[in-house]
């Protein structure tokens, strides 16, 4: 079952559905019912019609012995989705969390009796309409438990995703990888959203100096938290990581900007909140992060 029929949720559900004959094998649960007839458009432009079970009520979800629940909701909606769904599920089935930020992974892992794995992906997708999703670019997914447990489950799920055309690897250091992704998102998303620019424009004046200032704060914080730095041949591994992502995604418009323009809630709390709280605990000043938080908090409160 996939919970959250956004771009990644639908890409995941339809990709998994392609690998089986039974249209009821994969179900897609959301706050509104989508058409059961869906179209998955591949990166090379091929349109594949697929039939899938779509649901609104968790109590209607078919329970299967090999069931896995993938939570692909936005971070701010995930805890509510989990609490609504949990009473209807067998207590030992695996959950997979696909959220940005670092707000829900530990709380849900502590509350669920079964395996809770976290996934981080670079797959690209966007929704055309209620029955059409585009797999815009192939990426890679890593999946694992925060403490490195449930290795066999992680391997099985990675194999299942890879078989569905979504290249995946089971890892033992998913928490470190989530920290790395959090740093990237904390630098890029708020600045792109504030100035309404593409990722690549962060290379230009005056944005590049704000990128550097934010990276200086985050490098100090990651060192204080003893988070292993990403591989690098330079003395500035965190700077290298973020600038590489900016180069690679130069034409992209960050998800936080897309959310703002669509008048949707952003994931600013899940991305900036854990970093600011960790900095406060460590006694580290983060004026750049604080400024981004305040700007997004005002916009969020304005609706």
For each feature predicted by the language model, list its residue ranges.
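Helix-loop-beta segment of a Rossmann-like dinucleotide-binding subdomain
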Residues: 89, 132-142, 193-203, 252-262
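NAD(P)+-binding Rossmann beta1-loop-alpha1 motif at the extreme N-terminus of oxidoreductases
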Residues: 1-52
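Rossmann-fold dinucleotide-binding core
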Residues: 98-177, 181
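NAD(P)-dependent Rossmann-like dehydrogenase/reductase catalytic/cofactor-binding core
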Residues: 212-303
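Active-site-proximal catalytic alpha-helix in oxidoreductases
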Residues: 175-219
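Rossmann-like NAD(P)(H) cofactor-binding subdomain of soluble oxidoreductases
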Residues: 12, 38-40, 45-132
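Aromatic pocket-lining residues of Rossmann-like dinucleotide-binding sites
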Residues: 16, 108, 185
């Amino acid at each position: 079952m996939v919970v959250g029929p956004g771009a990644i949720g639908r890409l995941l559900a339809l990709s998994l559905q392609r690998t089986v004959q039974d249209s009821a094998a994969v179900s897609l649960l959301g706050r509104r019912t989508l058409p059961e007839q869906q179209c998955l458009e591949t990166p090379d432009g091929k349109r594949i019609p697929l039939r899938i079970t779509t649901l609104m009520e968790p109590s209607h979800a078919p329970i299967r012995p090999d069931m896995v629940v993938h939570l692909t909701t936005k971070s701010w909606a995930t805890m509510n989705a989990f609490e609504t769904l949990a009473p209807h599920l067998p207590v030992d089935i695996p959950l997979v969390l696909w959220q940005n930020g670092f707000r829900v992974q530990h709380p849900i892992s502590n509350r669920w009796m079964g395996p809770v794995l976290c996934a981080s992906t670079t797959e690209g997708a966007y929704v055309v309409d209620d029955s059409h999703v585009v797999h815009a670019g192939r990426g890679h997914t890593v999946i694992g438990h925060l403490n490195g447990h449930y290795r066999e489950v992680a391997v099985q799920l990675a194999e299942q995703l890879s078989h569905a055309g979504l290249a995946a690897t089971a890892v033992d250091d998913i928490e470190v990888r989530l920290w790395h992704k959090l740093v990237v998102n904390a630098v890029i998303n708020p600045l792109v959203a504030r100035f309404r620019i593409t990722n690549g424009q962060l290379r230009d004046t005056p944005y590049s100096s704000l990128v550097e200032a934010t990276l200086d704060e985050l490098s100090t914080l990651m060192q204080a938290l003893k988070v292993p730095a990403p591989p690098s041949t330079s003395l500035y591994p965190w700077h290298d990581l973020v600038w590489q992502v900016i180069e690679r995604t130069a034409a992209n418009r960050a998800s936080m900007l897309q959310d703002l323009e669509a008048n949707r809630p952003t994931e600013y709390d899940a991305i900036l909140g854990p970093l600011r709280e960790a900095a406060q605990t460590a006694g580290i000043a983060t004026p750049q992060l604080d400024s981004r938080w305040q700007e997004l908090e005002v916009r969020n409160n304005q609706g």
